[in-house]
């Protein structure tokens, strides 16, 4: 079954309002084994909406439309669908009843302008809106079934779940396909390299698809399939997951789609370990990432942004002589920072960073992009020194934070 999504409204078209509805609908359809081919958006124009509906119905089995069902003059979707289907608008008893019930339950008066929402294309099947005034509807146009829903996200989600998807599942009948997918997360490789290593995917795994998404500095690889039975779909997704791990290598750190901070948290919980962080160049970003994970209070104990040298001395016990001799950005300094924060917090691990995020502050010996990472644990302190610059302060800070988290992750393996 092929589906398309049509969003209507000037505010959506102009970007004033983000179309979160399309993303939600696509995810629900994907889980039901339905292939979403296109997302389309048109403004509040009767002719444009009608033309889009006609065009989409010629190539899709199912069309899901959002927006334009309200009582105002710019709510044109119902009339546009009627025009595309060459149907007249008629008062639908079910739509009228659901609207009257809605107003009575809320002790409100139904205005004349509201009655417009009970006018549906002739032959349409009303889909009751349990939490709003505007009913939705389903209308067959040739081989395509059109489902029209409100644009208000919570109303759309409710209608999609209770009124639209059950009808679509009935339309699928015995021809339903079952979807399965897995998401793998990668750190430490550029997108181009990941793409090269995925080159043989289609030949090795017929019937599987993959997509690559970047959220710097992580890369997410989603493998997916649709099959006549759920067991086959799940088995193929598992095989694809193993293929990706083999081809991409140890840079794949999660096959559950976890971000690096979440994977580190999972490993800390598994090891019954705790962590404390001392940050200089990352400015609290590591702590923010770790505490953004639900349940992080089980393993995250303390964070100190010891940006100034004196703070490193006063809070963490770093020797002034170490800083004077080697500099704040040095493996010697982060060694003492990591050891100090571990001691102060009483944590299993102490993680520390010091570096030069830029755009200024670099030298020939320590250019912008230089970061030193220290990790103190029960078996001592390890340090590392890396120089990787994106000539962008925010990107450098984020990369530094992920390099530190990756150091901890590998220690926990």
Swiss-Prot record:
SUPFAM superfamilies: CinA-like (SSF142433), Molybdenum cofactor biosynthesis proteins (SSF53218)
InterPro entries to which the protein is assigned, alphabetical: CinA (IPR050101), CinA-like_C (IPR036653), CinA_C (IPR008136), CinA_KH (IPR041424), Competence-induced_CinA (IPR008135), MoaB/Mog-like_dom_sf (IPR036425), MoaB/Mog_dom (IPR001453)
Family membership noted in the UniProt record: Belongs to the CinA family.
Pfam families: CinA, CinA_KH, MoCF_biosynth
Gene3D superfamilies (UniProt xref): CinA-like (3.90.950.20), MoaB/Mog-like domain (3.40.980.10)
Domain of life of the native organism: Bacteria
Protein name as catalogued: CinA-like protein
Residues that span the membrane, as ranges: none
Species this protein is from: Desulfosudis oleivorans (strain DSM 6200 / JCM 39069 / Hxd3) (Desulfococcus oleovorans)
Lineage, opening ranks: Bacteria, Pseudomonadati, Thermodesulfobacteriota, Desulfobacteria, Desulfobacterales
